[in-house]
Amino acid sequence: MTYTSGTAPNILQIIPRLDGGGAEATTLEMTKALTAAGGRSVVVSEGGKLSEAIIAAGGEIINAPVASKNPYIIYKNINRLAQIAKEQNIDILHARSRAPAWSSLWAAQKIGKPYLATYHSKVHDSPKLKILYNSVMTRGERVIANSEFTAARIGIVHKIAPEKIDIVPRGCDPTRFDPMHILDADIKKQRAAWRVEENEFVILCPARLTRWKGQMVLLEAVAGLKGNFRLILTGDTRDKTGEESRFAKELKARAFETGLSEKLVFAGHVANMPLAYAVADLAVLPSLDPEPFGRTAVEAQAATLPVIVSDAGGFRETVKEEDALSDSSTNRTGWRVSPGDVDALTDKLQTVANL
């Protein structure tokens, strides 16, 4: 069926939680687009920080235990989602994560509605059981990939024909991230909150606080920097139990060992990322594994920040380093370094700090 502005679809988006992350941000953006087109976005999740934003954008929230990987809960969710879809007059069930995707697929089959999924996460190629579990993301009418890199991985790992895969790169609203829209008073207040001193070079790592995002590598690289700087790490320092995570403790211990404790700020969850980018002089995304897309690199560039990213995955599609050190900025959007290469990262950090 082809939809027009007069027949925009009612979409059921199923996502485990609505906290910070690329999949969650895309759920909000889809809600805005559907509402603007005259359709409806009904989001089934266990709630989170973005729930209010989705409602404000015209979406509807239905709470259900769709984050669970318990087979019994997944089975129970089949009827639950089928009932929701019928009651809400849903046209398409759109899964955004693997656990609820199985329930979504079977619910769609039960009521005779189309099912599709967006592959936001890494496409694992082992073990075989994990590949089978993840294959639910490719069993619908279509599969949406967030980058050419992800699309290629889907084809290789899941043996999916290219014509079944739609590549829809993530993005951002450049107006929202334009630093000209940020008040100087707000920047000054945020700098004070993060203990940023005058003339400090502010390095921001806008990522979840988890090992594969590479914060430890960044900490080691910053330890070799010369000059006056401040390192800001975003992301919740607590684990699912509410206690300080093991990784956060390791970062703090290493910062103490390298003498960086006074230079390091754990910012926690940051709701106002445009303001965070406005405070920073540089954004660094040193992921150890290839990012499927890497939305924060796009956001940072929209905020006119120079970026340093890992030379892998989706970053290769969004961060171009041709002529990076020339006077011309025609082709330059940032710098890429090999994942995990501390010395190379230190060198690039020093290069940008000296510009």
PLM feature spans:
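Conserved acidic donor-binding segment of nucleotide-sugar-dependent glycosyltransferases
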Residues: K320-V342, T351-L355
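A short, active-site helix/loop in glycosyltransferases that binds the activated sugar's phosphate group
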Residues: G140-I167, C172-F177
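A conserved nucleotide-sugar
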Residues: R40, E197-F201, Q215-V265
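Short His-centered aromatic/hydrophobic patch
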Residues: A95-A101, Y119
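Short hydrophobic beta-strand element within catalytic cores of glycosyltransferases
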Residues: V43, P306-V309, R316-K320, S326-S328
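A conserved mid-protein helix/loop that constitutes part of the nucleotide-sugar donor-binding site
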Residues: E24-E29, F201, R208-G224, D343
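A conserved, positively charged/aromatic
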Residues: Q109, Y115-A145, A152
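Short alpha-helical donor nucleotide-sugar binding micro-motif in glycosyltransferases
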Residues: A85, H269-V270, A276-A280, R295
